Amino acid sequence: MSYILALDQGTTSSRAIVFDTTATIRAIAQREFRQIFPRPGWVEHDGREIWATQVGVAAEALTRAGISPREVRAIGITNQRETTLLWDRRSGEPLHNAIVWQDRRTAELCDRLKADGLEPLFRQKTGLVLDAYFSGTKLAWLLEAIPGARSRAEAGELAFGTVDSWLAWNLSGGKLHVTDASNASRTLLFNITTLDWDDELLAILGIPRAVLPRVVDSGAVYGETAGDIFAAAIPLAGMAGDQQAALFGQACGTAGMAKNTYGTGCFLLMHCGTRPIESRHNLLTTVAWQLGGRAEYALEGSVFVAGAAVQWLRDGLGIIRSSGEVEALAASVPDSGGVCLVPAFTGLGAPHWDPYARGTIVGITRGTTAAHIARATLESIAFQSADLLTAMEADAGISLAELRVDGGATANGLLMQFQADLLGVPVVRPRISETTALGAAYLAGLAVGLWRDRQEIAGHWQVDRIFEPAMGREQAAELRGRWGRAVERARGWAAP
């Protein structure tokens, strides 16, 4: 039998998963690595540690699966997006720690660019908002902060990359300096219409083209592993950012299909076809993937606090001992008793984008119990996701037929049922929850002919459970109206 090795490089750990030709998981290996916080608001990773943990778990997964590298048809890479590295092309050594997507050190630069009236230009070309979250301003900071870096970059001595590029460089022994279009579209430097680095944006940020990777398809044979890494040369054949890979792994391959990943936060993506849609509701437009030189696009929105709100019930309020207890506690009451909890602990993301919003609980009476607070917390995850989906439907002009879900919180049946009730469409949980790694495996497998086409891949996608909406639309509208009033009370609370 043939196998695909998926490398899933995340924010807190590096993982490797071996899939067989039926898309069944044969082995998983995982290692955490250090989070580095040099100053408040700064978040870094050691690029060497990312590489060491990733290659380590790859070897471990092959051992656990009981297979040799010669049986691996291809490697697919998926990664934490936006995290920025700069390294020496000759030595392969990073010049600085990786600047992580969560890092806010370039917020002032973004504010200056906005004050200069440049946000509409960036938005129109990249589909993104001008925010420190994305890679472009992080790279500009590195070129400015490291002595001599800009002149060395101009001379072609340095290489920039997001984590996919860094892994491909190391896996190929320094032969490949590439990124796929889905990762490139998260940099603030890539024009999502021309599918190329944008010279006007590069000039604004002072970034030389010579430092940038070549942009490639999300599924294609780019090269192979260097001889001393595994006991065989394995084709490197798939790359995609983690959320786009999850969309592919969920077989959301046609316009209007959507997936929501429920984790610490939520990431919701809707496939919107072969043309980018400019959002009118503060959503991001991104490349979903590029195959055969042709891009497909998605609308994306983020919920900052989802599972993190349940952690707060445990660690902050102490009303549960473990996150797993929240469902039983919330289910012990028939509803939230009129309580709304808006978990805007770090502001609100799309479609509101209000950094000054703060957490709010409204509707409390003497009859309110810990169970009502727990239920309102779970419901807040579904309300925030519903707000995003409504905005996406309006932007795309498409009515959602179903929502495919993944991530740890999908094990919570009460949450999934309430999500279906609010949306009025089925919520579908797949049998394989490792959809991010599966998406990378599918992209690589397609490139080497392990699977014929995307129709065959869609045939492998299997349902674990479908949550059908059971609430009347009038009641759902009433609940969403009440939620909207609660959000208004949370907004602007910490404004100067």
From Swiss-Prot:
EC code: 2.7.1.30
Binding site for glycerol: R81, E82, Y133, D242, Q243
Pathway: Polyol metabolism; glycerol degradation via glycerol kinase pathway; sn-glycerol 3-phosphate from glycerol: step 1/1
Protein name in UniProt: Glycerol kinase
SUPFAM superfamilies per record: Actin-like ATPase domain
Organism, scientific name: Geobacter metallireducens (strain ATCC 53774 / DSM 7210 / GS-15)
A GO MF label: glycerol kinase activity
Keyword Amino-acid biosynthesis annotated: no
Residue sites binding ADP per the record: T11, R15, T264, G307, G408, N412
Description of how activity is regulated: Inhibited by fructose 1,6-bisphosphate (FBP).
One GO term (biological process): glycerol catabolic process
Family: Belongs to the FGGY kinase family.
